[in-house]
Amino acid sequence: MKKIIFIACALTCTVSLYAGHSKELKLMSPEGVHEVMFRQERISSSVNEMVYQVKYRGREVVGNSRAGLQLDNRTWELALARKINQANCWMDNLEVDSVIYQPAVDKTWHPLYGERSTIHDAYNAATMYLSKKDGSNYRLNIEVRAYDEGIAFRYFFPEHPQAIFHKVVGDLTEYTFSSGAVAWTEQWAQAPFERLAINDIKLPVERALTVELPNGLWVALTDADVDDWCLTKFVASPTKQNTLTSVMYSPVDIVTYYATPWKIIMAADKPGELLEHNDIIQNLNPPCEITDTDWIRPGKIMRETTITTEGAIATIDFCAAHHIPYMLFDWQWYMPCTSHDGDATKVVSKLDMPRVIAYGKEKGVGVWVYVNQHALMKQMRELFPLLHKWGVVGVKSGFVQYASHRWATW
C-alpha cells in the first residue's frame, strides 16, 4: 500500500511540475462532471486574447469565450511620471508565465443559515499567472475552481510595487452559447421574467440568469463574494452571435492586492438541479467573520400590513400557531417613511410598539422593522441603540442604493 501511495504521489508531483510550465489551464471537477479550459489566443503580433470554455459531462456549455478586465491607470501612471505605452486593451500584452494546480479540496462545514445543516465543499483548483513584459510590473492571476456543481473563476491582482491604485473600467468576460439558446431574463429584481433568445437581450438583465441550451442542458450564470464590487449584468454582444457580455454599473477603484467576485457557471440536466446545487455560492463566499454567532437565529418572517396594534397582535398569534419566528413592520410604521424628513425614532399613533413587542416575546415571535435609507443615513448612531432598547430583534433596510461600487461597500 505504501508503494502505491508513493507512486501516486510521484505521478501527481510530476504532473503538477509539468503543468507549471504550461500556457493552458485545464481543470475537471472531482467526479468529472464539469470541465474548464483557459488559454491565450494570438490575435496579432502584439495582442493576446484570453479565452475559456466550459463543458458538462463532455457536452459544450460555454464555447470559446473571451475573459479578462479592462483597466485605465493612465492618471495614476502620469502622477508617478511613469512612461508606459497604454495598449488598446489592458489585457492585450499580458503573457502567461505559469499554470499551477493546487491540491484537491474535500471538506464539510456547517452554515449559520440555508437549506442544509451541513455543506460539502469539494473542488479541484488551479491558477494561471500572467504578467506584462513592458516594465510596468503589472500582474494578473486567474483563479479557477471546478466543482461537480459548476465552474467558478475570478481575477486576482497581486500587490503592485508602484501602482497602488487600479481603476477597473470594464469586465470583458463573455459567455458564448450554441445557436438556439434562450434565457429567462429580468431587468431588475422582482421584474417580470421574459424568455428571450440570447441575441434578443438588448437591455442589461440580472443575475442569476438561467439559460436553456438546445442540447437539453440548463445553465445558471451567477456570482459570489460580491460585497466589494459594483453591480454587473448581462447583455447581448453587439458584434458576436449568441454571446452575452458583462456590463459593469460603474468603474471600481481597487488597491492591490485584490480579488474580484467569483463568476459561476452551473450546468445541469434539469433546471431544478441548479437549485439543488446552490451550495456552490456559499462555498465561494468568504467564511463568517463573526466569532460569537449565538445571537444569529435565521428563520421565516411574516409581514404585518395594517400597521396597527390589533393587526400586529393577530399576526403574532398566526406566527406562533404556524411556527414562524418573526414578524415584520414594513414601511409606514414611522412617517414620512420615504423622505429625509422622516423620523424613525417615533412610531405612528395607531401602533403601540411596546405592547406589540412585549406580546411577541410572550408568544416567542420576534419583531422586525423596516427603515428607509434616508433615516438610516441620518439617524443610524442613535437609532440602533434605541431599537435594541425597545426589544426589536432585526432591521430590514429599505430602498438602499446598491448598484455602484460605493453603495455596495456601504
Predicted segments, located by residue:
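Short amphipathic alpha-helical segments and helix-helix/interface helices
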Residues: 172, 208-210, 316, 357, ...
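Bacterial Sec-dependent N-terminal signal peptides
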Residues: 1-23
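Conserved, mostly hydrophobic/aromatic
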Residues: 155, 319, 398
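An acidic-aromatic substrate-binding cleft motif
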Residues: 255-326
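N-terminal accessory beta-strand-rich subdomains and adjacent acidic, glycine-rich linkers
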Residues: 22-284
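Aromatic- and carboxylate-enriched substrate-binding clefts and catalytic-loop regions
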Residues: 331-410
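An acidic- and aromatic-residue-enriched active-site/binding cleft used to recognize and process polar
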Residues: 41, 147, 160, 180, ...
